[in-house]
């Protein structure tokens, strides 16, 4: 149970962590179910990064603050952070906690993430940094969830066409400026 708490703390709400501790098969055996997946990506990293010059520690700290800001709405909605990829994130709703309104929850979570970015911008602009934006792609469909990877390194993940579609939607945000 402690290993599960250590693995998922910070990636899932306490409610989700407790459910996984009570049902470890949800991790190891996996599941196939309808989920809502969201990819989010920071916009404006280059100007932000350049504003730090050689201060890598400062940039690392501000990026961690950004990730904290966009993660909290996910945890508040009982979603689960699947992974961080550079300045992007991927999270899922309706797994492992059932949410019959998960498409709506995912969209509301995305809006809450945008509000969190606005508050984050208030802070960094006051410090003389350029503001950033966030694009998001949300899709609902079938997902295959579970512990995946090699024996040397593995993590909880979600796979499926619905995941690829959410990623493509997020990439279109760049093209259409949303």
Where do the language-model regions lie?
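Regulatory cytosolic signal-relay segments
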Residues: 1-33, 50
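Short, conserved clusters of charged catalytic residues that mark active-site
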Residues: 3, 65, 164
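Catalytic NTP-binding/metal-coordinating core of nucleotidyl cyclase/transferase enzymes
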Residues: 26-108
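Catalytic core of nucleotidyl cyclases, primarily class III adenylyl/guanylyl cyclases
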Residues: 40, 73-105, 119-163, 173
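Serine endopeptidase catalytic core focused on the charge-relay Asp
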Residues: 113
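Short, intrinsically disordered, charge-balanced linker/junction segments flanking boundaries
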Residues: 175-178
